[in-house]
C-alpha cells in the first residue's frame, strides 16, 4: 500500500509516456505482487446520447488588450486574481478551462477561436480567458499561477488544478476538454471496484461486450485515445458497453488496477459473462477498434 500511496503523491511529470511496439504509446507504472484476477460475473449497460464536438475556426481572437473579440460571450474575461478565484468557486464541480494568453502571441490568437467554439458546444464546462499583458493585476495572476509560456491552459475542478498544457494544438485542446469534462456521454464513469461490480451485475443479460478503459488523470495517451472511445460508444451502443476508470482517482481505483494486473495505461479490459476475455494496451485507434470487433465475435484479419 505504501507503493500505491507514493505513486499517488508524485507530480504529473512522473507518469512517463513511452512508445510501445504495435500498441502505440502508453504510460507505465509498477506494482508489487501482480496476480491475474478473474473477478466479475456478467455484463451490459444503459446508454446516453453524446453529441460530438465539431470544431471550426471562427473570427474570434483574444484581440488587442482591453478589446473583447466578437461572438465569444461564453468565455469569461478575467481581469484579476480575485475575479479568477470567484469564477473557480462559482463553477463548483464543473470543469474550468482557463487560457492564459497575451495580445502579441500569434499562437494565442490561433487557438482562441477553437476555445470559443468549444465554449458554445460544451455547456457543462466553464471557459476563462486571462490576458497576461492587460494590467498589473493580470500579470500578478500569471505569476501566481506560474505561467511561463502562452498560450497556457489550466484545468480545474472544485477549485483544484487537475491538469495543464502549454503550446498545444486545437485537437489536443478538444481531447483534454472531452477527457476531463466528460460527464454525460454514453461512457459510464466508474469510481471504484463497487461501481465495476454494479455495472456488470446491472447488465447481467443481453450478451453485450463490456469495454473498460483504464487510465490515469495525467496521461497523454489516455487523453489522445478518449475521443475515439466516445465515438465508438455511440456507434457501437447496440452491442458494446463502454466504461472508464482513472486509477489515480482514489485508493479503491488503484487497488482495482493492482488486482487486474494493469501496469500500463491506457489498458482496455474486454469483459463478457463476468470474465475478462482479453485486453489491449495502447492508444492506437485502428488496433483498439480491431480488438473490440474481435472480442465482439467479428472475424478480424490483420
From Swiss-Prot:
Q: Which cysteines are joined by disulfide bonds?
A: 219-222
Does the keyword Transit peptide belong to this entry?
A: yes
Site: Deprotonates C-terminal active site Cys. Where? 213
Summarize induction of expression.
Answer: By drought stress and photooxidative conditions.
Active site (UniProt): 219, 222
Name any Gene Ontology BP term: cell redox homeostasis
User: In the database record, which residues form the transit peptide?
Assistant: 1-56
Per the entry, what this protein does is: Probable thiol-disulfide oxidoreductase involved in resistance to oxidative stress. May participate in the reduction of alkyl hydroperoxides derived from oxidative stress by acting as a physiological electron donor to the BAS1 peroxiredoxin. May regenerate methionine sulfoxide reductase B1 (MSRB1) activity through sulfenic acid reduction.
Which proteins does it associate with, and in what oligomeric form? Interacts with the plastidial peroxiredoxin BAS1.
This chain's protein is named: Thioredoxin-like protein CDSP32, chloroplastic
From which source organism is this entry? Answer: Arabidopsis thaliana
Q: What gene name is given for the protein in this entry?
A: CDSP32
Amino acid at each position: 500500500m505504501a507503493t500505491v500511496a507514493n505513486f499517488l503523491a508524485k507530480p504529473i511529470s512522473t507518469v512517463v509516456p513511452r512508445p510501445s511496439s504495435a500498441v502505440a504509446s502508453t504510460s507505465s507504472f509498477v506494482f508489487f505482487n501482480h496476480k491475474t484476477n478473474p473477478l466479475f460475473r456478467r455484463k451490459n449497460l444503459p446508454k446516453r446520447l453524446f453529441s460530438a464536438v465539431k470544431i471550426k475556426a471562427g473570427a474570434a481572437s483574444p484581440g488587442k488588450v482591453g478589446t473583447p473579440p466578437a461572438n465569444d460571450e461564453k468565455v469569461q474575461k478575467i481581469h484579476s486574481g480575485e475575479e479568477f478565484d470567484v469564477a473557480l468557486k462559482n463553477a463548483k464541480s464543473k470543469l474550468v478551462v482557463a487560457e492564459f494568453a497575451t495580445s502579441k502571441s500569434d499562437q494565442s490568437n490561433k487557438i482562441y477561436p477553437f476555445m470559443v467554439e468549444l465554449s458554445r458546444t460544451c455547456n457543462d464546462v466553464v471557459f476563462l480567458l486571462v490576458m497576461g499583458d492587460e494590467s498589473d493585476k493580470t500579470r500578478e495572476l500569471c505569476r501566481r499561477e506560474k505561467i511561463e509560456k502562452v498560450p497556457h491552459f489550466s484545468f480545474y475542478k472544485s477549485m483544484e488544478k487537475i491538469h495543464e498544457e502549454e503550446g498545444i494544438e486545437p485537437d489536443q485542446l478538444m481531447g483534454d476538454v472531452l477527457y476531463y469534462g466528460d460527464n454525460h456521454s454514453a461512457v459510464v464513469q466508474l469510481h471504484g471496484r463497487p461501481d465495476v461490480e454494479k455495472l456488470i451485475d446491472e447488465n447481467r443479460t443481453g450478451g453485450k461486450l463490456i469495454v473498460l478503459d483504464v487510465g490515469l488523470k495525467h496521461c497523454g495517451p489516455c487523453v489522445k485515445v478518449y475521443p475515439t472511445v466516445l465515438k465508438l460508444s455511440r456507434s457501437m451502443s447496440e452491442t458494446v458497453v463502454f466504461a472508464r476508470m482513472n486509477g489515480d482517482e482514489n485508493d479503491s481505483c488503484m487497488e482495482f488496477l493492482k488486482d487486474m494486473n494493469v501496469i500500463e495505461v491506457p489498458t482496455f479490459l474486454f469483459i463478457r459473462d463476468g470474465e475478462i476475455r482479453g485486453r489491449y494496451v495502447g492508444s492506437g485507434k485502428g488496433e483498439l477498434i480491431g480488438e473490440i470487433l474481435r472480442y465482439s465475435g467479428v472475424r478480424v484479419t490483420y
